Each structure stands twice: as C-alpha cells, then as structure tokens.
C-alpha cells in the first residue's frame, strides 16, 4: 500500500500541491484527473522521487518511498527515444543506465517486449514505430526492472481509439502484479482499467470520483413499443418533456422525479412502455460538475 500524507510543494513562491493526502491500494489502478496545470505531473514526479516535497510524506509498505526507488517504474508524458535505435537497443541502453547487468537484460528484454506486444518489433528502428507502439515501448522501458509500483503520465493522450484500447488492455494485465497510478483526461477510455479516480485542481484534491454508473434522478427516459399518442402535458407540472423520436421521450425537472409514479401516470394515459429508467451520468459529466465551482 502507498500512503500519501499532507503533501505540500511550492515552486517560485507559488503553491503547486496543497495538503494532498490519499492512499493507493495494492494491485489497484488509480486514475488521477484534472484540468491543465492542476498539478498532476508534479504530483506524479513526487511519487516517483524525482521531486522532493516541502512537507508531508510518501510511504510504501510503511517505509519512505525513497527507500523503494528500485521498485518504481515511471513513464513520463513525453518519452525521449533515440529514433535511430531499435527497440532492443533502446531497452538495453536504458537498462544499463538503470544498473541492470547483461545477463538480466538478455532475459528481460524479450520478456517485456512480448508482454507489451512488441515481440515482432524487437529489431525495428524506433522512428518506424506508430505512436501506439512507441507508448508501449515506453511502458516496456518503465517495467524493465520489474517494479511493483508503476506511474504513468498521460500514457494514451495522443493515440487513436485503437491505440488507447491497446494501452488500457496492457494496463489491465500489468495491474495483476503491480500497483498503478495513471494521470489521464480520457475518462471514458480510462474507466476500462482504473478502479477509481481522484480529481485534482489548483493543486488541491477535490475528492474521489468512483468508477460506478451513476444516474441523474432529475432525468427519466421512456421508450415505448409503439408511437406515443397525444397526451396531457398538464399532468406533469414543472417538468420539461423532450421528444427524442416517436417512441422515445425524456422527462426533466429541477427536482428528483418519482420513476414509479411517472410510469403509472403514463400507463393510465395509454402509453405502451418498453422501458423507463433514470438517465445515466457519464464520468466526464460528473468530473465537469465537480471542477466547475472550484
């Protein structure tokens, strides 16, 4: 378990991280989300040990994170590859800088390339790789020394839907043996691999955003088996009714609606209801609501 307690950091007299506290559980993938300049990358660099905070503590298994540097893997938002190197050469170069010996690298390089789906590109020059392949190579570099804590900064931000899907599937596989934190603004994609999300803005944690399907009790969508006949809107005072199509209507109000009472009223008016349900609230909508007033 990784425990972050009352973390605070100022740079050039500007408060960047303000009393940050949270926990990352073992084999959890935690998503860190927030608008630009919220402090996400700075927080991740503190977790990696690259930046030391002014105050607070970061512990891993009850010991300072600085005593676990060999257990941490880090992928920055912009990975600096040498484009003329092959995938194998790049990993070998990075591995030697990290203190891994030749025998270990001979064993680990084929293994990590296979794990990230680049075993057929082992001798491929990096400049010929797609964006998604480069990101997977970056993750291969981050896990080369077999860390137990993996930090990923926007790993899928510049990728197409297929590339983002591949990265999220890879993260799902990795979290079976690692604890992971990933910063992202691609919420609907990241919910595939993240167990929960924390929202940060202006260096402060606004709170958790769970990865559950929430509903808006102020909006109800009704689908019918046949086109809806004329009905009396006066039965629904202070309710806005939108006709999506002849067999689909949305009811909206400023206050929570009673779903069962609405169903009874519609049936009494001759509606043949196929389904009636509160409208789901997406992660992005909940995130925008959370940061709007801060």
Each PLM stretch: what is its role?
Residues 150-154:
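Catalytic Walker B motif of ABC-type/P-loop ATPase nucleotide-binding domains
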Residues 53-68:
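Conserved ABC transporter NBD signature motif
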Residues 92, 96, 103-121:
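Conserved ABC ATPase "signature" region
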Residues 48:
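Helix-to-loop junction immediately C-terminal to a conserved catalytic motif
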Residues 167-250:
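ABC transporter nucleotide-binding domain
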Residues 219-290:
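Short, charged/small-residue-rich alpha-helical element at the C-terminal edge
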């Amino acid at each position: 378990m990784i425990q972050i307690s009352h973390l605070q950091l100022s740079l050039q007299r500007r408060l960047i991280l303000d009393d940050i506290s949270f926990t990352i559980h073992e084999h959890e993938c935690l998503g860190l989300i927030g608008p630009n300049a919220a402090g996400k990358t700075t927080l991740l660099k503190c977790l990696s040990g690259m930046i030391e905070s002014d105050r607070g503590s970061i512990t891993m298994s009850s010991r300072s994170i600085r005593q676990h540097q060999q257990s941490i893997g880090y992928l920055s938002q912009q990975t600096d590859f040498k484009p003329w190197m092959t995938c194998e050469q790049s990993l070998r170069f990075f591995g030697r800088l990290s203190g891994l010996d030749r025998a270990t690298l001979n064993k680990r390089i084929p293994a990590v390339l296979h794990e990230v789906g680049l075993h057929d590109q082992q001798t491929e020059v990096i400049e010929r790789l797609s964006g998604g392949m480069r990101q997977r190579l970056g993750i291969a570099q981050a896990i080369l020394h077999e860390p137990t804590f993996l930090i990923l900064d926007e790993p899928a931000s510049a990728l197409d839907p297929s590339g983002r899907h591949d990265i999220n599937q890879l993260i799902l596989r990795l979290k079976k043996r690692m604890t992971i934190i990933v910063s992202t603004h691609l919420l609907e994609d990241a919910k595939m691999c993240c167990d929960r999300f924390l929202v940060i803005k202006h260096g402060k944690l606004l709170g958790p955003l769970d990865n559950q399907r929430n509903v808006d009790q102020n909006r109800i969508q009704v689908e019918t088996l046949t086109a809806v006949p004329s009905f009396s809107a006066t039965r629904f005072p202070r309710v806005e009714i939108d006709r999506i199509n002849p067999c689909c209507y949305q009811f909206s109000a400023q206050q929570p609606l009673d779903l069962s009472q609405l169903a009874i009223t519609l049936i009494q008016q001759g509606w043949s209801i196929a389904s009636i349900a509160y409208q789901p609230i997406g992660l992005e909508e909940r995130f925008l609501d959370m940061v709007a007033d801060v």
